[in-house]
Each structure stands twice: as structure tokens, then as C-alpha cells.
């Protein structure tokens, strides 16, 4: 039935060759337009049918025809601030046979506005400008402009003037409308969209999304944006469907109004960029009792900026609670030059979650367009599958030139006719497009490219309370004489100007986030009021304009004031070393980090100062040399007290008494709150492996749990049960009640699973439970091993030896006694790595003893029971554990599905099992891990 309706409709519109014919065809349907307006602070609606629109446009076309000086080549520039006026006068110009150009909203800066108006006057060959009387002052009295207000036209035009409606004679290849680009990279360009191009595009959209006659369309974006014109207005026309229009201000003041209108009009198709989806999500979650019937909704198109998968996932869940039947969020790619959206995903967020994507895939092309990715390093060559490169498009829906701008046209196309979009992306194995930022929004620091989009998302994902979301801009800056670009971050502060603590904390978190990803701190960090960060109608901020303002000195006074406040606050909170132990710790850090003593605050985290997991042990050695009298410093003292002052106090305490065992190691104690993350050690029992991961959570408390046995007089655990009870108890001492977030790495996955069961049995919620690359069934991996095998695995895990060496040396090592075996491993192993870890035979033996104790405790272990939630993170397995990653995931890790009440989520991660949390892979792993946590709501 549906197929026959579609075919009949396709045949009825297939003969249309221009937009005037399209409106005439639609006038014979029952469809029409509903316009909302606010009068006396009351929102009211008016409906006009397509037949009425045709008649009204015909009358207005007669009025345009009476303007003196018009020719068949004249351009009519339309500048209105309501959707109804733009639509009515657009069709008037179209029916009359003139070329309409739709003006964009003007900027407040009068100097820039004047330059823009004069540029358009020249570029569009002295167009006739139509506007409303109330908007005439916006044109600054420029005498050059051929300006007409429509109220005067209506009152002065002859009543009996005749006009030939030349619009119906237009050919498919004739230009139908000029759409203006945002001008984000300079002066606005005019994009000619042809009649046939537009008709092909809207039919391609309809085919791709399965829209049908009778589907209701809803728009809240100005008609100056190509998505409003093509995605909604013309798309609805070609189906003879109703379309609803409201001003953006109605929704931005109350995003629930969007959902109410979808319900009221039983909307099937609408549009919203990511920033507005976030507003809708927040409103729905803040109003859980809000009801709506959204069962008619088929497609919620989203474009203009990258869609965050977590947002799409959470919003999809909220929409389903209100009647939506399927996945309706359709992230897409489009430009003015491609008649708006022309590449869309139809499987968001499920596809993106399966692929562990942070930003939603953009799917495939509509009929009428093709895409390709070209290599950046080898110009003219196609990029390999999955390789990031330059996105280029071609096809009937793509424009072929910029109006009156030969230079821009020449630079926009390849020799073989493909349009260079300026975007970076890759096409995955399923043929779906994924974007990686704009070529001009790329920052190159010391030869390494970084995407502004990714850095901005990383900053905002930390949910920094001190900044306003969606107003963060990262741009390159290059000081005179600098050998490389540097990173500048501009943000809009949410804190009060006099809240110096919030200002300082916000700057610290932003700086740390950027540093973790790029290895360098922002060279410039500037808090700007929102009024200085202008957004387009789709919520985009022009990076090039921000950079130009930054480098021209427009922000200089704000930047200087901010730097002065931060310097004063740092001085205020700086605490010098006072005791002998504090001075010893400070001296050790000065020598170790090569920083001045005045740069070391006794209350700052040593990790913020630059200490990493790899050099933590070397710091301990340096510190032991500085102390007088000499004492042995357990690593736990540094791990448990990660500030210089706390380390000094702990040293003083340890001189007089023996510290008791504490499993909890604070890796990141942050004031901003958030659900703490508890990380449970692998088989070695130590927690250094989590230090790098913790650094990627600048606004979340992170704790690791170490085993018993590393400290003096600490007895090893006697059983798994004792271990689990101890860990659960100590976790609750830090966080008395859930929701909890717990992760176990390698063999620690077993402990994490058992701890989660204990907490859930106590009535607590474990909202996020992670098994980092280890299966539920472990007994068969360990029961036939002995201490020597454990030593080999520890040496491999610590990267003293590689897997090939581990296999080759196994028979020989089993013939040696304990001390000889330990010595042999260090003799054949990586000596530099051993020095970095401060590993000698004694310490290597201790680690092996602890791991062997763990092996003995779990050699008869059988997993039982179920937890509520589970995420499994997958790396390449050791060869002794599985044939390959597929075998590891499906046949080993896949068994976790038997031990969870709900669906287990699997996440592919970079690297091999033993190195997946190392420096080379930690950024990629943290990205996947944090996305999984966000999807679980922690």
C-alpha cells in the first residue's frame, strides 16, 4: 500500500522542472503552512493553504513588477525577520521570474554591518532590497542601496498593474535562489541553487528518510538557512504536506515548547542542531512527569555541528518514553552548497554505540550525491578505508559555482569536478561517513595535528561548572617568532567575576584537559562574555572570526585582567615548605622535575606538577636520598598522599609508628564532585597502572585499590572472599552510598565483579561496572601454573620482556631456583625499564609472590550470580589466551553475558592487553571509557 502511494506521488511530481511549477502543483493538495506569532505575549497560529500562498505570491509578484529599474536579470535581496514574510516574498520574486537572494541577520557591529551591506551590493550587482518598514534603520541610511520597504509597495502600487508570471518558464538548469554563506572565513559568498538541483535534492531527502504525503513538517530556523528552505519548506511542498513554523526565540526561551509542538501537530519530520538537542534533553530530564505523544515522529534531523553520541542516546531514551517507536535522531552532513543535508545516518545511536564512537556517524549519501575521502599526505590519491582525509562531494545536488566570484569557485573544486568541502573525515567499513573536524579548524603543534572540535568536546565533556556549555572555542595562535602554532582556548564563564576560586578551578581543569590530549598546555586562555561570541542560527561560532579578534588584540584587556586575577589567587593560595620533611620533599621535586622551588605549592597534587606513573618510583628513590635520617619509604605513602605536604606529614608519622593497611589509594581527589571511580588492581596487586587513566578525569574523584602485602608487616589475603569483603567495606568508607562506579583491570575484573555483587546485595546501586579485558571464567587460565609461570607473566606485564621471550625462556626458567630465576629475568630483560620501575630481584620477587597468592586464591573460582550492569573493554589478547580479538571477544569475554541482568556493552579499545593502559594507548582508551561512563549516567 505504502509502495503504491510513493510510486504514484513520484510520478505526479516527476515532470516538475522548476519551483513555480512545484508551488502550482502543491496548491492542488490539501497541504498548507501554519505560522506561529506572539501578540500581546500570547502565542497564536495562523494557517494558509498552498493555494492561498500561490494567490498571495501572485499578487505580491505584481507589486514587485512595478518597481522601476528592474530587468530580467535583477536580483531581489529579501531581508525580513519573520519566516512568513520571507516565504511570501520569496515566492513572489520566484513567480515573477526574478532571482531571489535571502539575506542573513545583520551583526550588531555597525562597521562590520556596513562592510557587509556594501559587499553584497557589489557582489549581487546592485540588487533591489525588499524589507519591512521596521527594519529599514538596520541599513544605516546607505544611499547606494536600492532599498524598498514592502509596506510602501503595498500602499503605492497601481491596483491594475499587469505582470507576466515568467517563473513557470524557468528551466531546470536556471538558478532558483541565491543563498548566502555565513561569511565565517571572510565576506559572505552567494551560492546559486538551481531549480533542478533543488528538486533532485528534496526528492533525494524524501527517498532517504521515507517521508510520505501527509507527514507534518516543523521548522524553527530562519529561512536564510538552507536547511529551513530545503529540509523543511520545499520538502513539505513536494509532498503536499503541512508545515509548521515558529520563531527560534520561542524555543530557546523554553525548549519544552519544541516537544509540545511536535505533539500538538503530530510532527513527522523536523530539525535541531546538537546544542538544542542538549537543551531538550535537559528539559525532559528535569521534568520527568512531562507527557507527550510523539508516535508520529519519523526523523529528527540534526546538523551544523557534531552530534555527541551520549546526548543522542539519552535523548532517544527520553523520546521513547513519550511514544517514539524507532531511532529518529538523524545526524547529517550538509552545506549551503549541497542544498543542506545530503548525507545522513539512519541508525543513531545504536550504530555509534556499537562502534564506540564519541561523535555520531553521519551515514550515507542521499540519491543525487556521492562522496570520497582524499589523502592529505598524497594529494590526488584516495585515502585508504578508515584513513582520515579531505571530504569531497559531487553529483546533481551539488552546486557548480559561487555567484560573481571566480576565485572562490576555482579554489572550491578539484580538476575532475569534485567540490572540496573543507571537512576532514573518514569512511568506515560499512560505508558511513565520520567527520574529524574542518581543515581550517586544525591546530598543528610541533608537527602534530589536533582537531578543534575534539578539544572543545573534551573540555565540555568534563562538565566544568565554571563555563557555559557550547560557548567553548579552541583556535590556533602563533606568537611572533614562534616555531610552531600554539593552542588558545576561549570560553564563556558561568562563575561570577568576583568568584576567584571558581575562575582558578576552571582554568586548571581546561588547562589539564588540553594538556592530557596534546601534551601541551594552552598558551592563551580567555574568559569572554557571551555577547562577544556570536552564534549562527545553528549555534555555530566562527573560529576564524574568534582567531582574528584574538590576534588583533580585541580580547587583550580581558586577557590581561584574567591573568592578573589568576596570578594574585595563586599567590594567595600558595603554601611554602615549613617543616624539614616538607623541605626535603620540595627539594626532591625541584631536582626531579627541574622546576623552581617557588613553583611547588605544598597543597598541589604531585600529578598536576608533572609526576606520572612511570616516574613515581624514581621520585621515591630521589626522595629517599634527600631524607635525613634515612628511612625506607613505601610507595603507598606517595600514592595515598598525593601532595607534597601530605607526603611530608605521612613520612613524619611513619617515623614514629607503623601505618595500618589501607586499600584505598586516592589518585584524583577533586573538589568538583561527580561519582567517584574505584579501580581494582590487576593480578600484580599494584595500582600504578591506573595513574595515567586517573589523569583523564580532571573533575572526577578517582581511587585505586591495592592489595595487601606490599607494606611492611602486611599479610597477604587468605581468600577471594576476604579480599572482596575488605574492598567493599573500604569503598563504602570513602563513599557510603551509591551509585557506584567500579572498574577492574585484567584479573581485577573478577574482584570488581564480586565487589559489585556484595554492594548490590547490601541494597546499593552499582551504576557502572567495567571489566577491562578479562573474561569471567579464569580458573583454567591459572590452575596449572606455578610461581615460575607467574614470574614470567609479571615480567611480561611490566614490559621487562616481550611475549616472544616469555614463550622461549619458559622451559629453561622452570629448571632454576627462585633467586636464579629472578636474576635471569633481570639479566635478559629491558634494563632501562627495570631502572625506571626501580625493580630489583627483591621487588620483582615480592610482586610475583603477591600475584602467585592471587593465583592460588582463584584457581578453583567459579563465577556465580549476576550484576545489574556491565561494560567490557576489549583489547588484542595474548596469544596464549585466544586466537585473535574476534575469538577473545566472542568466545571468552562474551561469556560475561551470562552474569548480567541487563545487556552487556562491549567496547573495542586500542592496543594489546598488557599495554592498553600505557601512555601510547591511554588517550584512546580513556575516550572510549569515559563515553561508556556517560552512557551509564555516571
From Swiss-Prot:
Disulfide bond annotation, renumbered to this chain: none
CDD domains: A_NRPS_TubE_like
Pfam families referenced in this protein's UniProt entry, alphabetically: AMP-binding (PF00501), PP-binding (PF00550), Thioesterase (PF00975)
Active site per UniProt: 746
One GO process term, biological-process aspect: fatty acid biosynthetic process
Renumbered residue ranges of the record's region Thiolation and peptide carrier (T) domain: 581-652
E.C. numbers: 2.3.1.-
Region (Thioesterase (TE) domain): 676-923
InterPro entries: AB_hydrolase_fold, ACP-like_sf, AMP-bd_C_sf, AMP-binding_CS, AMP-dep_synth/lig_dom, ANL_N_sf, PKS_PP-bd, PKS_thioesterase
GO molecular function (one): phosphopantetheine binding
Tree of life domain: Eukaryota
PROSITE patterns xref list: AMP_BINDING (PS00455), CARRIER (PS50075), PHOSPHOPANTETHEINE (PS00012)
SMART domains: PKS_PP, PKS_TE
Record region (Adenylation (A) domain): 44-445
Ranges where the Carrier domain occurs: 579-655
Keywords for this protein: Phosphopantetheine, Phosphoprotein, Transferase
Modified residues (O-(pantetheine 4'-phosphoryl)serine): 613
Function: Microperfuranone synthase is the only protein required for the biosynthesis of the secondary metabolite microperfuranone from phenylpyruvic acid (PPA). Several steps for the microperfuranione biosynthesis have been proposed. These steps include the activation of PPA, by the micA adenylation (A) domain to AMP-phenylpyruvic acid followed by loading of the PPA unit to the thiolation and peptide carrier (T) domain and eventually transferring to the thioesterase (TE) domain.
Protein name: Microperfuranone synthase
Species whose genome carries this gene: Emericella nidulans (strain FGSC A4 / ATCC 38163 / CBS 112.46 / NRRL 194 / M139)
Record lineage: Eukaryota, Fungi, Dikarya, Ascomycota, Pezizomycotina
Amino acid at each position: 500500500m505504502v509502495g503504491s502511494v510513493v510510486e504514484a506521488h513520484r510520478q505526479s511530481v516527476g515532470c516538475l522542472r522548476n519551483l513555480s511549477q512545484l508551488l502550482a502543483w502543491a496548491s492542488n493538495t490539501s497541504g498548507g503552512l501554519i505560522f506561529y506569532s506572539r501578540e500581546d505575549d500570547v502565542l497564536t497560529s495562523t494557517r494558509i493553504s498552498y493555494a492561498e500562498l500561490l494567490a498571495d505570491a501572485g499578487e505580491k509578484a505584481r507589486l514587485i513588477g512595478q518597481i522601476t529599474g528592474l530587468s530580467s536579470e535583477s536580483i531581489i535581496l529579501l531581508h525580513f525577520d519573520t519566516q512568513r514574510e520571507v516565504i511570501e516574498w520569496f515566492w513572489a520574486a520566484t513567480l515573477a521570474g526574478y532571482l531571489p537572494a535571502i539575506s542573513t541577520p545583520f551583526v550588531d557591529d555597525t562597521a562590520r554591518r556596513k562592510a557587509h551591506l556594501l559587499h553584497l551590493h557589489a557582489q549581487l550587482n546592485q540588487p533591489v532590497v525588499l524589507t519591512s518598514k521596521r527594519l529599514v534603520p538596520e541599513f544605516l541610511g546607505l544611499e547606494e542601496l536600492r532599498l524598498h520597504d514592502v509596506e510602501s509597495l503595498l500602499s503605492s502600487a497601481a491596483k491594475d498593474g499587469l505582470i507576466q508570471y515568467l517563473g513557470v518558464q524557468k528551466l531546470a538548469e536556471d538558478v532558483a535562489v541565491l543563498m548566502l554563506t555565513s561569511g565565517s572565513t571572510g565576506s559572505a559568498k552567494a551560492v546559486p541553487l538551481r531549480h533542478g538541483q533543488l528538486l533532485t535534492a528534496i526528492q533525494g531527502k524524501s527517498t532517504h528518510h521515507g517521508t510520505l504525503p501527509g507527514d507534518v513538517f516543523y521548522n524553527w530556523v530562519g529561512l536564510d538557512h538552507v536547511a529551513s528552505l530545503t529540509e523543511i519548506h520545499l520538502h513539505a511542498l513536494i509532498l503536499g504536506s503541512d508545515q509548521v513554523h515558529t520563531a527560534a526565540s520561542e524555543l530557546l526561551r523554553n525548549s519544552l515548547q519544541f516537544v509540545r509542538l511536535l505533539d500538538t501537530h503530530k510532527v513527522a519530520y523536523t530539525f535541531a542542531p546538537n546544542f538544542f538537542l542538549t537543551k531538550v534533553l535537559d528539559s525532559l530530564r528535569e521534568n520527568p512527569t512531562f507527557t507527550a505523544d510523539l508516535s508520529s515522529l519519523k526523523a529528527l534531523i540534526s546538523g551544523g555541528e557534531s552530534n555527541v553520541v551520549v546526548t543522542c542516546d539519552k535523548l532517544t531514551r527520553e523520546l521513547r518514553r513519550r511514544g517514539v517507536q524507532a531511532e529518529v535522531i538523524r545526524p547529517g552532513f550538509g552545506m549551503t552548497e549541497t542544498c543542506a543535508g545530503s548525507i545522513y545516518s539512519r541508525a543513531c545511536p545504536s550504530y555509534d554505540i556499537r562502534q564506540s564512537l564519541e561523535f555520531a556517524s553521519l551515514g550515507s549519501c542521499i540519491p543525487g550525491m556521492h562522496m570520497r575521502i582524499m589523502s592529505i599526505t598524497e594529494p590526488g590519491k584516495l585515502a585508504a578505508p578508515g584513513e582520515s582525509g579531505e571530504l569531497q562531494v559531487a553529483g546533481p545536488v551539488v552546486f557548480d559555482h559561487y555567484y560573481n566570484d571566480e576565485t572562490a569557485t576555482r579554489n572550491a573544486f578539484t580538476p575532475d569536478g569534485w567540490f572540496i568541502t573543507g571537512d576532514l573525515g573518514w569512511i568506515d567499513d560499512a560505508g558511513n561517513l565520520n567527520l574529524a573536524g574542518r581543515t581550517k579548524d586544525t591546530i598543528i603543534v610541533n608537527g602534530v595535528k589536533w582537531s578543534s572540535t575534539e578539544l572543545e568536546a573534551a573540555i565540555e565533556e568534563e562538565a566544568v561548572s565554571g563555563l557555559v556549555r557550547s560557548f567553548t572555542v579552541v583556535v590556533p595562535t602563533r606568537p611572533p617568532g614562534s616555531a610552531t602554532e600554539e593552542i588558545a582556548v576561549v570560553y564563556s564563564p558561568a562563575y561570577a567575576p568576583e568568584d576567584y576560586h571558581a575562575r582558578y578551578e576552571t582554568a586548571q581543569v581546561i588547562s589539564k584537559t588540553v594538556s592530557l590530549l596534546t601534551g601541551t598546555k594552552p598558551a592563551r586562555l580567555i574568559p569572554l562574555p557571551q555577547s562577544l561570541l556570536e552564534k549562527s542560527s545553528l549555534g555555530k561560532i566562527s573560529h576564524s572570526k574568534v582567531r582574528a579578534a584574538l590576534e588583533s588584540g580585541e580580547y587583550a584587556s580581558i586577557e590581561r585582567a584574567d591573568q592578573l586575577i589568576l596570578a594574585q589567587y595563586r599567590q594567595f593560595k600558595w603554601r611554602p615548605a615549613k617543616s624539614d620533611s616538607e623541605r626535603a620533599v620540595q627539594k626532591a621535586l625541584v631536582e626531579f622535575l627541574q622546576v623552581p622551588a617557588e613553583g611547588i605549592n605544598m597543597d598541589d597534587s604531585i600529578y598536576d606538577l608533572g609526576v606520572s606513573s612511570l616516574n613515581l618510583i624514581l621520585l621515591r628513590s630521589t626522595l629517599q636520598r634527600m631524607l635525613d635520617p634515612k628511612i625506607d619509604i613505601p610507595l603507598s605513602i606517595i600514592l595515598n598522599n598525593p601532595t607534597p605536604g601530605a607526603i611530608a606529614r605521612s613520612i613524619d608519622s611513619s617515623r614514629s609508628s607503623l601505618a595500618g593497611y589501607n586499600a584505598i589509594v586516592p589518585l584524583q581527589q577533586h573538589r568538583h564532585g561527580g561519582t567517584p571511580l574505584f579501580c581494582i588492581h590487576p593480578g600484580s596487586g599494584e595500582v600504578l597502572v591506573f595513574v595515567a587513566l586517573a589523569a583523564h578525569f580532571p573533575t572526577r574523584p578517582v581511587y585505586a585499590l591495592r592489595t595487601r602485602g606490599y607494606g611492611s608487616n602486611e599479610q597477604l589475603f587468605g581468600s577471594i572472599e576476604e579480599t572482596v569483603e575488605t574492598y567493599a567495606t573500604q569503598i563504602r568508607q570513602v563513599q557510603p552510598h551509591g551509585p557506584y562506579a567500579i572498574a577492574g583491570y585484567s584479573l581485577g575484573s573478577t574482584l570488581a565483579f564480586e565487589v559489585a555483587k556484595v554492594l548490590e546485595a547490601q541494597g546499593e546501586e552499582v551504576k557502572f561496572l567495567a571489566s577491562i579485558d578479562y573474561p569471567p571464567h579464569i580458573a583454567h587460565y591459572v590452575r596449572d601454573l606455578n610461581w615460575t609461570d607467574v614470574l614470567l607473566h609479571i615480567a611480561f606485564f611490566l614490559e621487562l620482556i616481550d611475549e616472544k621471550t616469555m614463550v622461549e625462556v619458559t622451559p629453561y626458567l622452570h629448571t632454576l631456583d627462585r633467586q636464579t630465576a629472578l636474576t635471569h629475568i633481570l639479566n635478559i630483560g629491558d634494563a632501562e625499564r627495570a631502572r625506571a620501575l626501580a625493580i630489583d630481584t627483591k621487588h620483582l620477587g615480592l610482586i610475583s609472590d603477591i600475584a602467585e597468592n592471587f593465583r592460588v586464591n582463584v584457581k578453583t573460582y567459579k563465577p556465580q550470580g549476576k550484576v545489574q550492569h556491565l561494560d567490557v573493554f576489549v583489547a588484542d589478547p595474548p596469544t596464549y589466551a585466544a586466537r585473535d580479538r574476534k575469538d577473545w571477544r566472542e568466545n571468552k569475554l562474551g561469556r560475561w553475558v551470562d552474569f548480567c541482568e541487563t545487556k552487556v556493552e562491549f567496547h573495542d579499545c586500542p592496543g594489546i592487553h598488557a599495554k592498553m593502559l600505557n601512555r601510547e594507548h591511554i588517550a584512546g582508551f580513556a575516550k572510549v571509557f569515559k563515553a561508556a561512563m556517560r552512557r551509564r549516567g555516571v
